[in-house]
């Protein structure tokens, strides 16, 4: 007898519906699993048979063939255990075929028949709805994640025996309901700019970066607060939209980083990989590519501390995600494109010992050592970073002042207002910040007053700007004007943008 159920796997950050076709026929007893299964799926036939037996269900010894279609897609999800088991029971006539139509099954089975959670439930739920399926059977720990998508009846199934009783009408399971949990209000941040005394220029630069989605390089001596500033960047970014939150949750679900009963991710990611991270860890990879750090930081902040300590190869692969806001990973089995709309915040010392240019410490590095150190970061990579700032030690009086510094909430209010102006301006392009503008958009939306043009032209020749640097300065100036509520870019806006590009002394341009 033939039966068909639906399972799912993931490809990139999207779900893929898998037709599970089961045929039971007379002949030599056996269990064949075909359709390009990966190792974890090949092992499922042993888990399924043992789970069925330990659930108190006896099957006749016949020839079983399971086909996972489409056959040209590699299946690598242990979540196919449940649809294979249900399909097998349906082919034996133990479960009505009508009861499994229009339903997606996705859970790993333990040997005693219990349902275990898997990664990637959210993209599977989205794909199920797109394919017109109406019911989704998952492990209890995956219930909240599946409920993020409207239009599906989600059933949290404890074990295979319970599911069989439900499908045969012996027991009725009620659809899972969202748990009434309080969403965290991120108005009160753990890391707040109010804790940072002094460093006014650096805080201003990060505000501009947050408002326009610009990348930032912070150069300073040890103890000047580079890391402290960077870790507060997320606190001044606008709240996530529902679409952004779902996209981030999909990525974390695929990566297995979504905690139990986490539900929707509501805070912007902040990723800070160690400088020993490999290229694969940074951009993603594997035989079937999985997201790397640039994708895990999507719609958030990627912080690279001690930038020159990263391998040159790892740094150079950042060019594509910074420029295109996506990264393409090619492997023998698949070529996938992952999103990477990030704000890069990089920090570094000015020299190997860290004290070049410091008033209180003598730098022990030779000119050659400093040159080799700064050359670890290529010109093309630095050219893609919009804002370059240098920070010095915090003044004693700033450290001991009784006046509280401006809070993240106050800075964020200005950032949100500037972002709204950009959203309205760029809505026809489906863009949301100035950093995403291309050259034609810059010409259309970035009108410079005559004196501002004069300042830009002088800077272009004086500091030998590249065409890319020229455009990035204009985009930063447009953001500064948006923070001021100005329609045109004035001289003061372009002057500040130029200062934020050329004030770190690394001979970048």
Which residues does each predicted region cover?
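Short loop/turn elements that form and flank the Walker-type P-loop nucleotide-binding site
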Residues: 59-62, 99-100, 132, 150, ...
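Conserved alpha-helical scaffold flanking the Walker A/P-loop in AAA+ ATPase domains
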Residues: 207, 264, 269, 279-302, ...
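Basic, amphipathic alpha-helical bundle interface domains used for macromolecular binding and assembly
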Residues: 37-45, 58-60, 67-77, 288-289, ...
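Peripheral, non-AAA+ core regions of ATP-driven protein-machinery
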Residues: 1-217, 224-227, 330, 469-470, ...
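Walker B catalytic acidic pair
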Residues: 299, 305-306, 317
């Amino acid at each position: 007898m033939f039966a068909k159920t639906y399972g799912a796997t993931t490809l990139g950050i999207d779900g893929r519906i898998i037709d599970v076709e089961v045929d039971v026929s007379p002949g030599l007893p056996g269990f064949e699993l075909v359709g390009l299964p990966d190792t974890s799926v090949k092992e499922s036939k042993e888990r399924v048979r043992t789970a069925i037996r330990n659930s108190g269900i006896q099957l006749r010894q016949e020839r079983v063939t399971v086909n996972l279609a489409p056959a040209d897609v590699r299946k690598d999800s242990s979540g196919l255990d449940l649809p294979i088991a249900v399909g097998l029971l349906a082919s034996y006539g133990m479960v009505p075929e009508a009861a499994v139509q229009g339903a997606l099954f996705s859970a790993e089975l333990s040997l005693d028949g219990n349902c275990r959670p898997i990664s990637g439930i959210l993209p599977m739920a989205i794909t199920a709805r797109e394919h017109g399926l109406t019911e989704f059977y998952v492990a209890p720990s995956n219930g909240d994640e599946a409920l993020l998508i409207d239009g599906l009846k989600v059933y949290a199934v404890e074990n295979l025996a319970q599911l069989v009783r439900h499908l045969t009408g012996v027991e009725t399971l009620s659809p899972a309901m969202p748990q009434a949990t309080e969403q965290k209000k991120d108005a009160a941040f753990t890391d707040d700019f109010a804790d940072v005394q002094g460093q006014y220029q650096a805080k201003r630069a990060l505000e501009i970066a947050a408002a326009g989605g610009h990348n930032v390089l912070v150069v300073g001596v040890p103890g000047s607060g580079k890391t402290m500033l960077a870790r507060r960047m997320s606190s001044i970014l606008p709240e996530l939209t529902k679409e952004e939150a779902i996209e981030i949750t999909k990525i974390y679900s695929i990566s297995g980083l979504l905690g139990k009963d986490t539900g929707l991710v509501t805070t912007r990611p902040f990723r800070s990989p160690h400088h020993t991270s490999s290229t694969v860890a940074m951009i993603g990879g594997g035989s079937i590519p999985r997201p790397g750090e640039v994708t895990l930081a999507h719609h958030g902040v990627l912080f690279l501390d001690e930038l020159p300590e990263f391998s040159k190869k790892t740094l150079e692969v950042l060019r594509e995600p910074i420029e295109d806001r996506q990264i393409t990973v090619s492997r023998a089995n698949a070529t996938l494109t992952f999103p990477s709309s990030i704000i890069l915040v990089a920090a570094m010392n000015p020299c190997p010992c860290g004290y070049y240019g410091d008033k209180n410490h003598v730098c022990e590095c030779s000119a050659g050592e400093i040159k080799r150190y700064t050359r670890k970061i290529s010109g093309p990579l630095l050219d893609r970073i919009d804002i370059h700032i240098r920070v010095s030690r915090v003044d004693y009086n700033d450290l001991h002042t009784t006046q509280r510094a401006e809070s993240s909430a106050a800075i964020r209010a200005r950032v949100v207002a500037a972002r709204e102006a950009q959203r309205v301006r760029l809505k026809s392009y489906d863009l949301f910040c100035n950093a995403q503008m291309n050259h034609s958009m810059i010409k259309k939306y970035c009108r410079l007053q005559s004196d501002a043009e004069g300042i830009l032209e002088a800077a272009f020749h004086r500091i030998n700007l590249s065409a890319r640097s020229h455009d990035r300065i204009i985009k930063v100036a447009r953001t500064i004007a948006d923070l001021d509520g100005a329609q045109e870019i004035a001289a003061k806006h372009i002057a500040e943008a130029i200062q934020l590009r050329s004030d770190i002394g690394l001979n970048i341009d």
